[in-house]
């Protein structure tokens, strides 16, 4: 999960990383009040989870409260790379002498942690890596020892930071590593990391990506979710413990196992070409769970999408037997109630014959059992096209 800048900076401050004083505003009037409280020049910064805010006009310096009101009025509601600006961070302007770059990230290719730092900050780091790769220091971090003062100094020196910034940057890097580890982050980035005119090293910007697999250790992360940016069906599925991603098609998909569901998306897309371009409406992996409750939750979410005209339930029985899935489907339809959208069901594997028998004897008009995956995909696409 990516954090907004203001959320990242709050996390930084909690761990002792120096950041400019600032507050979040959702209206121009709030921006004016914050600027009055801070005094002097302030910076009004669009809060979106996208880069290039400055180039898009989403970062503006204001000379005082009234100017902050005007700048916030111009920024709020802007579209930056497909993201609408709903809030701005109003913070004290900094006296910038030099700009650097620093980050800690999970290096998946080498299965370790990586520190990256550069004397060339304030620009897209990808640009630095492409045009001047020697300016970007890369230091692998031993997860058993982490980043202490000596390691932090090694990173700062490797980045060729000036002597005036080495000590301050080293202290900041140790604290930044603490954020990375304690927050269970996969990325912690400061760009720019600045040296001020009076010799202080400050995180002027902040980017943090949290590992959602570690959410069980961080119940407080629920408060960080950007509800406005999350699809309501995806949020509902997450609350139910379901792995659901909304797509743009008309055929709802339920499967057990990510690989099978991905294959199902492909087969439905191919079959849909024959029926006016019908496509998958979602990705929904129920994993090993085929209980009535899981099925009911899955169907309820999929059928809440008005674009869904048919549902393809594709199950390969393994540890979860097909007869259990069939019973789950029958009970789920009773729980959901009043379902008119056709369900094409393909069962294969463990106890598939028994599963088909259960569906047949249930005599549910909306359930259409099909033996093959290709045949089921074709029927699901055909039914969706007919209902469009």
Swiss-Prot record:
Which positions bind ATP? 45, 52-54, 91, 94, 99
PROSITE patterns assigned: ATP_GRASP, SUCCINYL_COA_LIG_3
Which pathway does it take part in?
Carbohydrate metabolism; tricarboxylic acid cycle; succinate from succinyl-CoA (ligase route): step 1/1
Query: Which reaction is recorded as catalysed by this protein?
Result: succinate + ATP + CoA = succinyl-CoA + ADP + phosphate; GTP + succinate + CoA = succinyl-CoA + GDP + phosphate
Could you give one GO CC term from the UniProt record? succinate-CoA ligase complex
Q: Where does Mg(2+) bind?
A: 191, 205
The residues the record assigns to binding substrate are 256, 318-320
Q: Which EC class does it fall in?
A: ligase
For this UniProt entry, the molecular function terms from Gene Ontology, in alphabetical order, are: ATP binding; magnesium ion binding; succinate-CoA ligase (ADP-forming) activity; succinate-CoA ligase (GDP-forming) activity
UniProt remark on cofactor binding = Binds 1 Mg(2+) ion per subunit.
Which residues belong to any copy of the ATP-grasp domain?
A: 9-236
**UniProt xrefs under Pfam families:** ATP-grasp_2, Ligase_CoA
Identify the keywords attached in UniProt to this record, alphabetized.
Answer: ATP-binding, Ligase, Magnesium, Metal-binding, Nucleotide-binding, Tricarboxylic acid cycle
Name the Enzyme Commission number(s) assigned to this protein: 6.2.1.5
Functional description taken from the UniProt entry: Succinyl-CoA synthetase functions in the citric acid cycle (TCA), coupling the hydrolysis of succinyl-CoA to the synthesis of either ATP or GTP and thus represents the only step of substrate-level phosphorylation in the TCA. The beta subunit provides nucleotide specificity of the enzyme and binds the substrate succinate, while the binding sites for coenzyme A and phosphate are found in the alpha subunit.
Subunit field text:
Heterotetramer of two alpha and two beta subunits.
Q: Which family does it belong to?
A: Belongs to the succinate/malate CoA ligase beta subunit family.
Q: What is this protein called?
A: Succinate--CoA ligase [ADP-forming] subunit beta
Which gene is the coding source of this polypeptide chain?
sucC
């Amino acid at each position: 999960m990516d954090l907004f800048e203001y959320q990242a900076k709050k996390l930084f401050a909690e761990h002792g990383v120096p950041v400019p004083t600032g507050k979040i505003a959702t209206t121009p009037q709030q921006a004016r009040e914050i600027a009055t409280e801070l005094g002097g020049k302030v910076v009004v910064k669009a809060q979106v989870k996208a880069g290039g805010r400055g180039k898009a006009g989403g970062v503006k310096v204001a000379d005082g409260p009234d100017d902050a009101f005007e700048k916030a009025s111009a920024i709020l509601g802007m579209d930056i790379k497909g993201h609408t600006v709903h809030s701005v961070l109003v913070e004290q302007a900094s006296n910038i002498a030099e700009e650097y770059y620093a980050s800690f990230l999970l290096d998946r290719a080498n299965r370790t942690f990586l520190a990256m730092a550069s004397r060339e900050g304030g620009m897209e780091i990808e640009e630095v890596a492409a045009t001047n790769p020697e300016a970007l220091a890369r230091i692998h971090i031993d997860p058993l020892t982490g980043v202490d003062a000596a390691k932090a100094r090694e990173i700062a020196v490797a980045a060729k930071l000036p002597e005036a910034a080495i000590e301050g940057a080293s202290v900041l890097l140790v604290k930044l590593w603490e954020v990375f580890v304690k927050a269970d982050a996969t990325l912690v980035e400061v760009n720019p990391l600045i040296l001020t005119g009076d010799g202080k090293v400050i995180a002027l910007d902040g980017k943090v990506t949290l590992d959602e697999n570690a959410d069980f250790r961080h119940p407080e992360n629920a408060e960080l979710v950007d509800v406005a940016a999350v699809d309501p069906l995806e949020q509902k599925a997450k609350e139910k413990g379901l792995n659901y991603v909304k797509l743009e098609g008309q055929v709802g998909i339920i499967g057990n196992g990510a690989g099978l569901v991905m294959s199902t998306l492909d087969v439905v897309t191919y079959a849909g070409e024959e029926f006016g371009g019908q496509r998958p409406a979602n990705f929904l992996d129920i994993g090993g769970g085929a209980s009535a409750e899981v099925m009911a939750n899955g169907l309820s979410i999929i059928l809440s999408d008005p674009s869904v005209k048919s549902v393809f339930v594709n199950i390969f029985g393994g540890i979860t037997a097909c007869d259990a899935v069939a019973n789950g489907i029958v009970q789920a339809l009773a729980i959901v109630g009043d379902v008119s959208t056709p369900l094409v069901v393909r069962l294969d594997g463990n106890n598939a014959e028994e599963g088909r028998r259960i569906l047949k004897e249930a005599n549910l008009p909306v359930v259409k059992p099909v033996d093959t995956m290709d045949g089921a995909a074709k029927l699901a696409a055909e039914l969706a096209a007919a209902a469009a």
